[in-house]
Each structure stands twice: as C-alpha cells, then as structure tokens.
C-alpha cells in the first residue's frame, strides 16, 4: 500500500514535467527589492508584489525591531487564548476606521482569511457565484464549502445578473477580486454592488492587489461607497510590504467569525512585531501619494513603450502588467532569455492561469527607475525576437 502513495506522487510530478508546468523555487537574495541576486548574478526584479517598496522602508523596519524588543518575536498563542494584544486591537480598530467598516479581524494570510470566511459563512443549500478568474484561495474555499459553486464570465456584471435570476434558493454570496492577481484588471465593483444589493445577496471582495495602490490614501478598489462590499479582505504582503491579512465586515459578522472561523481560532496570532510593522507601513501608505504617483508614472512609461514595440498587453492600469504568450514552453524560454539579459521575470503557467494563457507576469513598483523600465522594454524586444 505504501508504494501506492509514491506511485501517485511520481505520476503527478511526471505529468507536470510533460506539460511544462513544473514549478521551481530559487533561493534569491533581495526578492523584495528593485535588484535581486541569484548566486553571483544580479537582475532587475520585475516579479515582486512590493508595489510601493515598503518591505525595506526604514520606518517599517524600525517598527518591527521596536515591536520585537517590546513584545517579543512570537504571539505565544491563538488570539482566543493569549495571543491577542493591544497591538492587534489597535491595528484592527485603525483598519476599520480607515476603510469604513464597523469591524476588522486580523488573519495570518490572505489565503487563510478567504478560506475561513467562505467556510464559516456558507451552508448546504447556499450558492456561491464567483468570477471565473478569482484567486485560487477563493475558488478552493468555494469548492470545499457545502454551498453550490457557480462561476460567471470574468468581470461580466450581466452574466452575474443572469446567474442570480436562475439560482434563487438559499443565501447567495458573490465573490470577486478588486484587482485580479494574474491579469491586473479591476472588477466593476459599483455594478456588482448594485446587482447584489438588488438581489438581496452579499458581495465579498478580495482586494489584495488594490489596497495601498488604488483609491484615496490607497484605500483600495472598494473605498468608494458605490462599490462597498459586505465583506472585504485586504492583505499586507503586497503594497503594505509585510504579511498577513484582515477581514472587514459588520459587527455581527465579526462576532460570528470569532466563534466559527477555524483558521482564526486554531492558529497562533500574528507576532506583535509584525503587527507593529503593518501599523507603521499603513502610516506610510496613507501619506504615500508620491509613491503612488511614481508607480503610476512607471506604469504609463511601460505601457507606452510596450505599445510602441507592438506588444499586446492586457487592459490593466495597475502594477500588474501581464504579457500573455500562450504556450508553456515558449513562455519558459522567454523568461530564460530575459534572465540572460539581466531581467528577472517569472513564467506563470497553468494551473495558476487557464490553459493556453501562460504569461510573463510583469509587476512594476514605485522603486523602479525610468532607466529600469527602458531596460525591461529593450530586453523584452530582444528576447521576443530571439524566441520567435
């Protein structure tokens, strides 16, 4: 029987290799920085989610160090035991006030927050209606829940409305992202919010890639009242530059999650030092108009240059600028050609993206210089010609 386990593992790994979808990791230095090192070779980094460059911001680093000195490096337990402290309480209140919700609850990661929220709220007879391109954490949570999952065409409010007319029984939860992690486009939140309110169902938005970057003071995609969801998930590992996540919701929902969200109840709380760093990073985010403007300038420079070179980019006005290649092997080869030219880009392939849509996921940050963008464009042009 033991051999059956290894046979299953060997078959799965062999299939990934055949399909050119085998994932690898590199032990890199400076993965959150503008420049990255692999061994003795240095590259321009265009794969980081640290959109505002806060992972190395001196105020954020100092806050982490001070938090560790004052409160230690671990929380010591679940938030339901001894792990929830004044740092956590203060950050939750600050988030709720800033984003316009009655309550906020901290989680160890965005994946955990999404899984906990969907798993705790849904029951048999409910319906989940999710954008087809929603993040794996959302779709997996929906598939593992007792609810019936239906997917609607990407960013298609009319398709959602048709599904809502068809699926009338039980509670209904509509799920989408603010900024889509692999495509960089934004959900039409005002239209989705209007439809869900009219239908009497709830809207859940994962704004991992919008918070800090989009909206007034970086409040994200859902900051305007017209697009306000019932449930908002924000994460701190992208533009905020740290890690962790929070769920924003009504007070009864927060109390319910404290009773029934197993990912929250049975996980050690985030370290106080991490919470202090997030708090400091949010201060930088709120006054970070100059950082957001620098990021926007880089986005405009890249898109104009790419258009001049004839590249067909996705309709994204965010830090995520995917260049869809299609074929898995060709995408891997193009990524390798770029590394030979000193540019680090990751080849994203199925199952992360749909079959036939393998891509280079180009991410721009406020730390990039204009010369960096020009180097990227030149390298893309040269590598594309060689890879044709």
Curated annotation (Swiss-Prot):
Family per record: Belongs to the class-II pyridoxal-phosphate-dependent aminotransferase family. BioF subfamily.
Enzyme Commission number(s) of this protein: 2.3.1.47
One Gene Ontology term from the biological process aspect of the record: biotin biosynthetic process
Binding site for pyridoxal 5'-phosphate: 110-111, 181, 209, 235
Subunit structure: Homodimer.
Cofactor(s) of this protein: pyridoxal 5'-phosphate
GO molecular function: 8-amino-7-oxononanoate synthase activity; pyridoxal phosphate binding
Pfam families attached to this UniProt entry: Aminotran_1_2
Highest classification ranks of the organism: Bacteria, Pseudomonadati, Pseudomonadota, Gammaproteobacteria, Enterobacterales
Listed pathway(s): Cofactor biosynthesis; biotin biosynthesis
Keywords: Biotin biosynthesis, Pyridoxal phosphate, Transferase
Primary gene name: bioF
UniProt superkingdom: Bacteria
Enzyme class: transferase
InterPro entries reported for this sequence: Aminotrans_II_pyridoxalP_BS, Aminotransferase_I/II_large, AON_synthase_class-II, AONS_Archaea/Proteobacteria, AONS_Proteobacteria, PyrdxlP-dep_Trfase, PyrdxlP-dep_Trfase_major, PyrdxlP-dep_Trfase_small
Residues that bear N6-(pyridoxal phosphate)lysine: 238
Gene3D superfamilies, per the entry: Aspartate Aminotransferase, domain 1 (3.90.1150.10), Type I PLP-dependent aspartate aminotransferase-like (Major domain) (3.40.640.10)
The protein, known as: 8-amino-7-oxononanoate synthase
Known role: Catalyzes the decarboxylative condensation of pimeloyl-[acyl-carrier protein] and L-alanine to produce 8-amino-7-oxononanoate (AON), [acyl-carrier protein], and carbon dioxide.
Catalytic activity: 6-carboxyhexanoyl-[ACP] + L-alanine + H(+) = (8S)-8-amino-7-oxononanoate + holo-[ACP] + CO2
């Amino acid at each position: 029987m033991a051999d059956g386990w290894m046979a299953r593992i060997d078959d799965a790994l062999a299939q990934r290799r055949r399909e050119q979808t085998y994932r690898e990791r590199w032990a890199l230095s400076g993965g959150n920085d503008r420049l990255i090192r692999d061994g003795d070779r240095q590259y321009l980094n265009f794969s980081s989610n640290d959109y505002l460059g806060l992972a190395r911001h001196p105020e954020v680093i100092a806050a982490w160090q001070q938090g560790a000195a004052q409160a230690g490096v671990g929380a010591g337990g679940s938030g339901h035991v001894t792990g929830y402290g004044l740092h956590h309480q203060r950050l939750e209140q600050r988030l709720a006030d800033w984003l316009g919700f009655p309550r906020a609850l901290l989680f160890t990661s965005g994946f955990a927050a999404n899984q906990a929220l969907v798993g705790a709220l849904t029951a048999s007879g409910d319906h989940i209606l999710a954008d087809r391109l929603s993040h794996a954490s959302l779709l997996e949570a929906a598939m593992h829940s007792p609810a019936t999952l239906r997917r609607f065409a990407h960013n298609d409010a009319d398709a959602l409305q048709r599904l809502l007319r068809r699926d009338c029984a039980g509670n209904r939860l509509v799920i989408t992202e603010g900024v889509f992690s692999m495509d960089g486009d934004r959900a039409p939140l005002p239209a989705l919010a209007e439809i869900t309110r009219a239908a009497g169902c709830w809207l859940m938005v994962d704004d991992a890639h919008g918070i800090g970057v989009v909206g007034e003071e970086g409040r994200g995609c859902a900051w305007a009242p017209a697009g306000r969801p019932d449930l908002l998930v924000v994460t701190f590992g992208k533009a905020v530059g740290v890690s962790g996540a929070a769920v924003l919701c009504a007070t009864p929902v927060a109390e319910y999650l404290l009773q029934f969200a197993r990912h929250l109840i049975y996980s050690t709380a985030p370290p106080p030092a991490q919470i202090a760093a997030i708090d400091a990073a949010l201060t930088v985010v709120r006054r970070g108009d100059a950082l957001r403007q620098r990021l926007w300038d880089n986005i405009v420079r890249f898109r104009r240059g790419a258009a001049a070179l004839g590249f067909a980019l996705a309709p994204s006005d965010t830090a995520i600028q995917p260049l869809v290649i299609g074929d898995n092997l060709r995408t891997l080869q193009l990524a390798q050609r770029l590394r030979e030219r000193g540019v680090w880009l990751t080849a994203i392939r199925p199952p992360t993206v749909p079959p036939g849509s393998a891509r280079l996921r180009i991410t721009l940050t406020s730390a990039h210089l204009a010369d960096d963008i020009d180097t990227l464009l030149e390298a893309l042009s040269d590598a594309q010609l060689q890879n044709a």
